[in-house]
Structures are given as C-alpha cells and as structure tokens.
Amino acid sequence: GLFDIVKKIAGHIVSSI
C-alpha cells in the first residue's frame, strides 16, 4: 500500500545517512 512506499523511502533515507 501507500504506507509501504513511505516506509521504503524512509528506509532508503536512513540507509543514506
């Protein structure tokens, strides 16, 4: 769902840090 996409993006940001 949409929330899954948000979580995926958030996880990508965390990984980028």
Curated annotation (Swiss-Prot):
Keywords: Amidation, Amphibian defense peptide, Antibiotic, Antimicrobial, Secreted. Expressed by the skin dorsal glands. The modification Isoleucine amide is found at residue 17. It is found in: Secreted. GO terms for cellular component: extracellular region. InterPro entries: Aurein_antimicrobial_peptide. One of its GO terms (biological process) is defense response to bacterium. Antimicrobial activity against L.lactis, M.luteus, P.multocida, S.aureus, S.epidermidis and S.uberis. Probably acts by disturbing membrane functions with its amphipathic structure. Shows anticancer activity. This is Aurein-3.3. It comes from Ranoidea raniformis.
